[in-house]
Regions:
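Acidic/His-rich active-site region of diverse nucleotide-sugar glycosyltransferases
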Residues: 86-88, 143-159
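Catalytic-core segments of class I nucleotidyltransferases/pyrophosphorylases
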Residues: 48, 102-104, 111, 117-124, ...
Length: 206
């Protein structure tokens, strides 16, 4: 798969700070490997080797571990934020890397095992500006939920609802295939998130 990917790796991991200290969340180990290394492996296993990562909090350990990606069978470039830009704002910083083809976005601080080819194929079939991977959660109270229509388009988002508002258990995984045209709605140099800012704008635009 010739698609490029952006890894969002700027997270501080405040809830883990008592355990991890100053270590950035993407470098938190899981079974002996940093979380972000598992994301890089997932991309490589799916044939994606051209990767850009957005960095914010304490980037030095990440840069030291990964370098240019040669030791991991990929090519890694970096965009370091001077101030927090949010998920979409950070990815906007990578548009010179992305070019004019659909691209993949993943989190660098969450481990998953996912068929990225299937997601890319569904995106190509749908003609959507954004295609997101969803997960059926056994504990929907903890996450932002996505309510789809019958055709697979998004009807609405519900952020960490109480039980009486739980109408689905489908969770936004933070894994997306995005058309570059969708990123035109993201302002340059401003904090802007996918779930709370960009996706509602896309829904309003139809």
């Amino acid at each position: 798969m010739g698609m490029k990917a952006v890894i969002m790796a700027g997270g501080e991991g405040r809830r883990l700070k008592a355990v991890t200290g100053e270590l950035p969340k993407p470098m938190v180990p899981l079974l002996g490997k940093p979380l972000m290394e598992r994301t890089v492996e997932l991309l490589r296993e799916n044939g994606i080797t051209d990767i850009c990562a957005t960095l914010g909090y304490n980037p030095a350990p990440i840069l030291s571990h990964f370098g240019g990606g040669e030791d991991f069978g990929v090519h890694l470039s970096w965009r370091i934020e001077d101030k927090p830009l949010g998920t979409a704002g950070g990815v906007k910083n990578c548009m010179d890397f992305i070019g004019d083809e659909p691209f993949l976005v993943l989190s660098g601080d969450a481990a998953c095992d996912f068929d990225l080819h299937r997601l890319a194929d569904e995106h190509a079939r749908s003609g959507a500006a954004v295609t997101m991977a969803l997960y059926e959660s056994p504990d929907p109270l903890r996450y932002g939920l996505v309510v789809p229509d019958a055709d697979g388009s998004v009807r609405c988002f519900i952020e960490k609802p109480p039980w009486e508002r739980v109408v689905t258990n489908l969770v936004n995984t933070g894994i997306y295939v995005i058309e570059p045209r969708a990123m035109e709605l993201v302002p340059e140099g401003e904090s802007f998130d996918f779930a709370s800012d960009l996706f509602p704008k896309l829904m309003d635009a139809g």
